[in-house]
Amino acid sequence: MRSPAALLPVVADGGGGVGVEEEMDVDEDMAMCGGRGGGGGEKKRRLSVEQVRALERSFETENKLEPERKARLARDLGLQPRQVAVWFQNRRARWKTKQLERDYAALRQSYDALRADHDALRRDKDALLAEIKELKGKLGDEDAAASFSSVKEEEDPAASDADPPATGAPQGSSESDSSAVLNDAEILPHKPAPAAAADAAASEETEAVVTGAALLHHAEVFFHGQLLKVDDDEAAFLGDDGAACGGFFADEHLPSLPWWAEPTEQWTT
């Protein structure tokens, strides 16, 4: 006698196996209903360990159950095709559940790793922000100190300019000293070298010697000319008429020009 579950219509599922319209209890799916006993109770026969192992090996090979494969397994294992179909259906559901658990565990592990990286990056970010803030504070302090020092330096020269000179020297002394230094600097480069000065002195001395010799020569000529004229006058007075007349009427020799009126050629002799 068949169980009520065996009388339910069956439909093929998407995986190629056989499914029922209503959900059945696992024990009822795994059991085979027998005839009624003396106690009036319904006996159930469960699958043996060998049958379960054979079905597991077949499921690991292919989790989809084809009609020909279902009939062959039922014939080889001494089961009804309905029992084979129900076992594959339940086994596939458990496999999907375990697959979801494995996927969840993998995703959870990835999530934990990403969360740890995220926390580490957040800590690094906070540390960098704190360092940037500290550096900005130091930079601001340095800028403030630099501006303060610059203002102080600008104020110090102004105060020193406003104070009178402490030495008591005239205010124009610095300008005169600077101008004197500039004048000395302008004059010193134009001084002749010692060799040039010696040459100039030697040339001036030579010119002086030549000029002195020329003056002596002209003086001597002028002196001799005057002596000759005095001798002629003396002879005229002493009675030398001829000499006197001759000397008186004779063409008077022009005296030589003084040394300062003579031609310039004699200066070079």
Swiss-Prot record:
Subcellular compartments: Nucleus
Compositionally biased intervals (Polar residues): 170-180
Keyword DNA-binding: yes
Gene Ontology terms, MF aspect: DNA-binding transcription factor activity, RNA polymerase II-specific; sequence-specific DNA binding
SMART domains: HOX
Superkingdom of origin: Eukaryota
Main subcellular location: nucleus
Region (Disordered): 143-180
Role of this protein: Probable transcription factor.
Protein name: Homeobox-leucine zipper protein HOX20
Species, as recorded: Oryza sativa subsp. indica (Rice)
Species lineage: Eukaryota, Viridiplantae, Streptophyta, Embryophyta, Tracheophyta
